[in-house]
Every structure is written in C-alpha cells, then in structure tokens.
UniProtKB/Swiss-Prot annotation:
Motif OAR: positions: 358-371
Protein name per Swiss-Prot or TrEMBL: Diencephalon/mesencephalon homeobox protein 1
Underlying gene: Dmbx1
Region (Interaction with OTX2 and is required for repressor activity): 1-156
Top-rank taxon: Eukaryota
Region of interest: Disordered: 129-250
Amino acid sequence: MQHYGVNGYSLHAMNSLSAMYNLHQQAAQQAQHAPDYRPSVHALTLAERLAGCTFQDIILEARYGSQHRKQRRSRTAFTAQQLEALEKTFQKTHYPDVVMRERLAMCTNLPEARVQVWFKNRRAKFRKKQRSLQKEQLQKQKEAEGSHGEGKVEAPASDTQLETEQPPGLPSGDPPAELQLSLSEQSASESAPEDQLDREEDSRAEEPKAEKSPGSESKVPGCKRGSPKADSPGSLAITPAAPGGGLLGPSHSYSSSPLSLFRLQEQFRQHMAATNNLMHYSSFEVGGPAPAAAAAAAAAVPYLGVNMAPLSSLHCQSYYQSLSAAAAAHQGVWGSPLLPAPPTGLAPASAALNSKTTSIENLRLRAKQHAASLGLDTLPN
C-alpha cells in the first residue's frame, strides 16, 4: 500500500476525524512556536480546503505540495501598433540583439521575453513561406520542361526510326585487333619477298648484261598473292625477320597452299633452267681469256650463310639435304659454264680457285634464289 505523506500522515488517515484533529493540532502548535510564520495550506480545515478546490487538487497538493500546478500564461494579444513596430524591426534584421529587443520592449510596452519569442516565431513563419515559394517555382519549372519535352520527344523518335531502318554497315571505330594483326602479317609476308628481289636485282645488275628469265619472274607474283594462313595443313611455320631485324610476333607460313612434292620438283626444274641460262650468258660474255672477270662475278655472288640460317634449323631439312646431294651429283654440269679452264701463265691466285669452291658457290646461289622464288624470307643466323 502506498502512503502519501502529509506531514507524516497517510491519506487514509485524513478520512477519519482523528486525523483531521491531529492536523489541526499540529498546525496550531506550529503557529504557537512561530508567531510570524504564515500557516501553511495543511493547517486549513477540511471544509475550507474542499470549498476552494476539488478532491483531485487535494491529492496533487498532498503529493507535490502547494506549488504543484504549472503556472499557465494566457496568449498575448498584440495591438496594431505593437505589430507594426515589430514588423519594421523584423524587416531591418531577423536577429535583433539584446539592446534592440529591450528598446523595442520599452517602446511597445511588452516584456523582453515576449519580444524574443515573437521574433523566433516570425523567423519560423518566414522560412516556411520561403520553402513554399521554392516548391511553387520548382513545380512551374517542371511543368515548363514537360511542355518543352513533349515537343522534343517527337523529333528524336523519327531520328531513331531512321537509324534502325539503316542497315548496319562497317563499325566506325577502329578495326578489331585480330584484323589488324592479320593485315600486318600479310603486309610483312608480302614485303619480305619484294625486299629479297630488290637485293637480288642489285647483285645481278653488277654483273655485266645479266638478264632475268621469264620463268623466274612468274614464280614470285604467285607467292605474293598468297595470304598467310597459319592453319593450312602442309604449310611450313617459319617466323620471318623484317629488313630491320625485328621478328614478327605470331608464326605464319610463307605460302597460301600446301607445297606438294610434285610442285616443288616442277618449280625447282623451271628455276634451274632459268639459272643455267643466266650462268651461260655470263660465261659467254666474259670469254675465255678473261677468267679474272668470272672470278670477280663469282665473288660478287652473295654468301648464303650471311643472311640464311643453317639448313639444319629449317623445317624443310630433308628437302634441302636431297637438293645438296643432287647438286653434288651434277657438280660438273653446274660448275663448268661459270669458270672455263684458265689458260697457262695466269696468276697463282686465279689458278688456286678450283671447281669444288665454284660448285659450292653455285649451290648457295641456287638455294638462295630457289628460296626467294618460293617466298621464303631470309633468317638471321
């Protein structure tokens, strides 16, 4: 059971006469001990207390004392003159300092606290009005943009229809990397035989009145027309070197179609006929009494080992081994037209050049020309 203290007595005791008598006696004793002391609310009789307040007020007063009720303030009613003075000050500044508020309070006959609260409420009202104006402006802008956007939507719609009806052509951007790589490989493979032909033509131009036969010319365009196909079954995967010496990235073949044994033999036979005619022309024009010119022509022939890799490192090793064996078998036929028998009385240096060295030089020249006709580029050592 809860007890609500009233000077040490419970509320239930107030219902009895003895409780009221004790309260009255206690109040009388306090008044006697302190004559100048005002008697408290508890010293009043129950009839006096009930006459001025309700039972709920008695309970609240017993619980919290006589000052339990919150003092309520009535709403301040500003006059027209007070509102005019306050509005003029608000137009000058929204945050008046203490001095300005005190002067305004003296002019309007209002407490300074009321002036301060009025400015606080006035600032809140001003911010609310500003927000409403901003919302209205945004709404108007959206409506204006919507009206303009409706007119613009029709024009882009027709443009998109034209774009969809137009067939998709080649992409305007850069070509794919695979296409660029294949084009670069093809250009490199086509430029390599051309550079080889230029070097051969320069070396042949140094020889007196050397002519190129039509048989050897007919081989090279066929090789240049072929595009590199790395996935062809019979092609030879060789990484050619550019004239500057840099190796290409992916390995690709030098021929577009597989090289059959019959085709190799036919090309070699035609090419040998062309080179034999060339050698015969040079030997006839040099003549018998001038073997030194023939030796110079043989010396002018480029050495195969300078620009070509060893035959053992090539993929067509067996073919070149058979080629060298055939060249050794026909050593006398190939070596006789280039250098005739030197007459007696020549210098010892020209006599020391025997037929074996001449056959090796001829073999290197023919192997190099045959590789150029097939489109095989030179490889560094």
